[in-house]
Amino acid sequence: MQAIALPEEICWLLEDAEDFLAEGLQNENLSPGAQDQRDHILRGFQQIKSRYCWDFQPQGDDLGQDGSDENLSGTHGPALASDASFWSDYQEEGIDDIIRGAQELDNVIKQGYLEKKSKDHSFFGSEWQKRWCVISRGLFLYYANEKSKQPKGTFLIKGYNVRMAPHLRKDSKKDSCFELTSQDRRSYEFTAFSPAEARDWVDQISFLLKDLSSLTIPFEEEEEEEEEDKEQEEMYNDIDGFDSARSGSQGRAMALPEPLDKEEDVYEVLPDEDDLEEDACGAHRRRVDYADYYQGLWDCHGDQPDELSFQRGDLIRILSKEYNMYGWWVGELNSIIGIVPKDYLTTAFEMEGR
């Protein structure tokens, strides 16, 4: 649906009204009735925006509007066609389930206060404005504060590149800056409260971008069916060979081996000494290949049945790196086997040269 074109003055008036309700009355001591009416009107704003495709901006894909940060001339426009598949995943949930209050979001990967660079700031306004920022479900949302009921802006992280950006500032905070850039969408610049915090934001967004680009692993059903057919064919060949041997015996009784007159020695085949280690109690046990063990860098919750969930610090045994080109390995944790994102793991043991 194309956005309905409104006169610029009406757009400004609606923006001012919404901003006053959302932020101007945020900390006011309202009666319960007035508070309910305020929330009701704000929900109406969101529903109207969703119905008429307002605030889905071609530059930045913002949902919601930070009046001091964005250019009002680009406020209203149709959603990008390239992101239609993403928004279709949330059609049943509705816009209210996507745009929630800062404390109502789920699947939060990273959140905290950042300074966001305003696209167009007033003469008296600051170029950098403090915002409560949250990464959730593939979205980057920024709020006026951590108790805000709706974001001042939202954009899709997929399709962006993230990097440290010390060139954004020339003061003492230059090493705490980072930016998200895209070829066909607007850029976003942020300043954290320390260089380490900025690097953590960059790392979290980088891993999320890799995860979004490799959500599915190609699965060739035809190859699996061919392997099953081949196994069945081999089984049938074995049975046919057994039947032909029986038919060639002309129905003779099978000759059983005669019992041994004297008992023969029975020897147990033991593994090589190189494959054994001796523990403190003197008992032998099979050697552990420490190179197969990796440690979780972050918490990872599997969204699919074949994905292995683990927490930071968990020791995971890697069974296969068959899907390495897609960014996934096959691992085992507590006797549970599943695929794990390799970028979430690090080697657990340092191997010394022998």
From Swiss-Prot:
Keyword Amino-acid biosynthesis in record: no
Modified residues (Phosphotyrosine): Y142, Y236, Y267, Y290
Expressing tissues: Expressed in mast cells (at protein level).
One term of GO molecular function: protein kinase binding
Domain PH, first and last residues per copy: 107-210
Post-translational modification summary for this protein: Phosphorylated on tyrosines. Phosphorylation by FYN on Tyr-267 is required for GRB2 interaction. Phosphorylation by FYN on Tyr-290 abolishes interaction with FYB1. Tyr-236 is dephosphorylated by PTPRC.
Entry GO terms, CC: cell-cell junction; cytoplasm; cytosol; immunological synapse; nucleus; plasma membrane; plasma membrane raft; protein-containing complex
InterPro entries: PH-like_dom_sf (IPR011993), PH_domain (IPR001849), SH3-like_dom_sf (IPR036028), SH3_domain (IPR001452), SKAP1_SH3 (IPR035765), SKAP_fam (IPR037781)
Subcellular location per the Swiss-Prot or TrEMBL entry: Cytoplasm; Nucleus; Cell membrane
UniProt keyword annotations, A-Z: Adaptive immunity, Cell membrane, Cytoplasm, Immunity, Membrane, Nucleus, Phosphoprotein, SH3 domain
Region entry Interaction with FYB1, spans: 285-290
Main location: cytoplasm
UniProt free text on domains: The SH3 domain interacts with FYB1.
Family: Belongs to the SKAP family.
Protein name as it appears in the record: Src kinase-associated phosphoprotein 1
